[in-house]
Amino acid sequence: MPNAVPSATVVKTPLFRPSFWSITVFVLVASGIGIRAYRDLSRPDAWDYWKDQYIAPSMTVSLIDKTYLAGRDQGRRTLAVSGTIGPAASRLLRDRVDEAKLTAGDLILLSSPGGELNQGAIMGEIIRSHGLATAVGTADASGRIKPAYCASACVLVYAGGKPRFGVLGSALGVHRFVTEKPMKDPVADAQRVTGAVLGYMTKMGVSSSVVEAMSETREIRWLAPKDALAMNLITDPLSKP
C-alpha cells in the first residue's frame, strides 16, 4: 500500500508585524501631538480659545440663501452671525465665509451684545477683505430682516462692512472699552486701546466722533440713527433717520 502523502502545513503569516522603526515613529508622532497640545493649552487664555472653538462656541454663524433688506431688494446670500464674540470668533467667521464662498455684495447680518475687542476688529477686517456688506438684524423664515442690536465689539464687526446698511428699529451701542486683566499702567493701557480703535475706525471710513462717543461712558450708549449716519457708521440707511 503506497505511503500516505503528508498534508501540507499551512503557515499563517500575520497581516502586519510592527517593526521597531514603525513603533518608534508612532511614539514620536503621538508625543509630538501631545506636546503641541500641552504647549497650546499652557498659553494664557488658551483654554478659553479651545473651548470657544471646539467645545461650546459662544457665537453661531448660519448661511441663509437669500435675505431681503427692503421691498425692492432682489435678495442676497447672507451669513447670520449671533451671540457673544468669543476668543475663537474670527476663526469661525473666516471658516464660514470660505465655506459659503461669499462674494462682494453678500451680507453679514449681525445680532450680538459684543465680546472680545480684538476678535471684533479681526472679524471686521475679514468682512472688508471680502467686500461684504453688513447690517444689524435677524432673519425670519422668509428671509425678511427684523430689527436687532449690535453693541460694544460688535460695532467693530459692523464697521468692516461696505456698505453698512441701517435697518429700521435696529440699534448700535458703543461704550468705553476696558480690560478685566490687571495692568501696571491702566491709563497708558486705556490710551493704547483708544488709539487702536481710532485707527481701526478711521481705516474703515468711520468718523473719529464715534470713538469720542465711546470714550464718554462705560455703559452702553445707543446711537440715534441720525448720529450713526453723521458718524458715517451707517452708510446706507434703509429708511430716513
Predicted feature residues:
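A short, well-ordered alpha-helical element
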Residues: 85-106
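STAS-typified acidic loop motif
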Residues: 53-56, 64-92
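Hydrophobic membrane-insertion alpha-helices, especially the h-region
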Residues: 17-39
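Glycine-rich beta-to-alpha active-site loop
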Residues: 119, 128, 132-178
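Ser/Thr/Pro/Gly-rich low-complexity linker/stalk segments immediately outside membranes or between
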Residues: 40-63
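Second-shell loop/turn segments in exported
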Residues: 78-85, 109-115, 139-148, 179-188, ...
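Charged, glycine-interspersed solvent-exposed loop segments at helix/strand-loop junctions
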Residues: 173-241
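N-terminal Lys/Arg-rich, disordered targeting/topogenic segments
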Residues: 1-16
